[in-house]
From Swiss-Prot:
This is Serine--tRNA ligase. It catalyses: tRNA(Ser) + L-serine + ATP = L-seryl-tRNA(Ser) + AMP + diphosphate + H(+); tRNA(Sec) + L-serine + ATP = L-seryl-tRNA(Sec) + AMP + diphosphate + H(+). InterPro entries: aa-tRNA-synt_IIb, aa-tRNA-synth_II, aa-tRNA-synth_II/BPL/LPL, Ser-tRNA-ligase_type_1, Ser-tRNA-synth_1_N, SerRS_1_N_sf, SerRS_core, tRNA-bd_arm. Its main location: cytoplasm. It comes from Endomicrobium trichonymphae. GO terms for biological process: selenocysteine biosynthetic process; seryl-tRNA aminoacylation. The lineage of its organism: Bacteria, Pseudomonadati, Elusimicrobiota, Endomicrobiia, Endomicrobiales. Belongs to the class-II aminoacyl-tRNA synthetase family. Type-1 seryl-tRNA synthetase subfamily.
């Protein structure tokens, strides 16, 4: 959530930042509410002063064993009623302000390229080179079904479209990928954490999924609970309404979870395979950092996510997203896009973002500095470390052999217990 003070003092700049996101937002109503709020607060303060003086006068008279005049008692009751009415109006206006601010996205960092959409993203670097095959490489779903390790028909029968059943060596490979990711990130200083898959509305609002993305979320019909779209939601919320000591930062967490999203590809090749499903597995990285170090923490987050891809021998590239492509809560995002030999293109496998104080303001997470005891909002960061299903798919496409078999990357073999999946 944005600081209303920033909007109040820099409304033209904030409006331009929204235009850079392809959003034409008028802040006139918000500023009117803000002005009205200030006026009401002033009235309440004056009325409280008046009430206090009248109460003191009543107290003085009673101390002198004198009966307070009926007019004075009536006046103090009248002031009390006016204060209560003004406080009700204040609550209504503050609710309007909060509802408005909850729907406004983060301001892009100055280093983010201004652009309309993904076509304006900036490629930062390539890591590794795609292998040239002596045969036409197949898509991962073709490979998986022929090997008997992916069963989309069974998943469709069980749940419907955009789900997958992994079997035999496929299940073992997925489990191996998850364990590999967790181990490698723990070696980098991340603390492993396991959280609930069901979270309340406050948690989803805190990270920015609600209210704007409610239609993309799976919600329980009876309880006011949501299936998590990413472990970012529960992990970031562990410090909601907390104050962290400066010496405790940065805090770095790694968490494996299943993820659930209603959105799904409706055209092209994304209607097949493991790229875009309602349920998928992901290892998530979350950081809590001091504002002055969050930019550095983002760069190291990108390196940590890329490290596991390099260890798996998967070629990828790092892309800086433009203002027209970054997510709602993000101030700056790098995508890691892995090479898919079957597709013949790079596809997103991780998004690493600096949210700055956007989530911290929604969740009231602060850092206390040791020198001056000052408390201020900290910065949160998160990134996939990385998407398990897409890694599974990338391994099938990049390590496929002409006979239909798939070689297991060297770094995974101690986790799988086998080095090849044969037809």
């Amino acid at each position: 959530m944005l600081d209303i003070k920033v909007i109040r003092e820099n409304v033209k700049e904030v409006k331009q930042a929204m235009l850079n996101r392809n959003l034409d937002i008028s802040f006139d109503q918000l500023l009117n509410w803000d002005s009205e709020r200030k006026t009401i607060i002033g009235k309440i303060e004056q009325l409280r002063l008046k009430r206090n003086k009248e109460s003191e006068e009543i107290g003085r008279l009673k101390k002198e064993s004198k009966e307070p005049p009926a007019e004075l008692l009536a006046e103090i009751n009248k002031v009390r009623d006016i204060i209560q009415e003004q406080e009700k109006q204040l609550l209504t206006i503050e609710k309007h302000i909060e509802d408005f601010l909850l729907r406004i996205p983060n301001i892009p960092d100055k280093s983010v390229p201004v652009g309309k959409d993904e076509k304006d993203n900036k490629i930062i670097r390539f890591v590794g080179k795609p292998e040239k095959f002596s045969f036409k490489p197949k898509y991962h779903w073709e490979i998986g079904e022929k090997l008997g390790i992916i069963d989309f028909a069974a998943a469709s029968k069980i749940s419907g479209p955009h789900f997958a059943v992994l079997k035999n060596e496929g299940s073992a490979l997925e489990r191996a990928i998850i364990s590999f990711f967790l181990d490698k990130h723990k070696e980098k200083g991340y603390k492993e954490i396991t959280t609930p898959y069901l979270v309340n509305r406050a948690s989803m609002t805190g990270t920015g999924q609600l209210p704007n993305l409610e239609e993309d979320s799976f919600k329980c019909a009876i309880d006011d609970l949501y299936l998590i779209p990413t472990a970012e939601v529960p992990v970031t919320n562990i410090y909601r309404d907390d104050v962290l000591e400066e010496s405790a930062l940065p805090q770095k967490y790694v968490s494996y979870s299943a993820c659930f999203r209603r959105e799904s590809g409706s055209y092209g090749k994304d209607t097949k395979g493991l790229i875009r499903n309602h349920q998928f597995d992901k290892v998530e990285l979350v950081k809590f950092a001091k504002p002055e170090t969050s930019s550095e923490e983002l760069e190291s987050l990108v390196l940590d996510a890329g490290n596991v891809l390099e260890l798996l021998g998967l070629p990828y590239r790092v892309v800086l997203l433009s203002t027209g492509d970054i997510g709602f809560s993000s101030s700056k995002t790098y995508d890691l896009e892995v090479w898919f030999a079957g597709y013949g293109i790079y596809r997103e496998i991780s998004s690493c973002s600096n949210l700055k104080d956007f989530q911290a303001r929604r969740m009231n997470i602060k850092v206390k500095y040791s020198q001056n005891k000052k408390r201020e909002l900290l910065h949160t960061l998160n990134g996939s470390g990385v998407a398990v299903g897409r890694t599974f798919a990338a391994i099938l496409e990049n390590y496929q052999q002409e006979d239909g078999s798939v070689v297991i990357p060297n770094s995974l073999r101690e986790y799988t217990g086998f080095d090849i999946i044969k037809p």
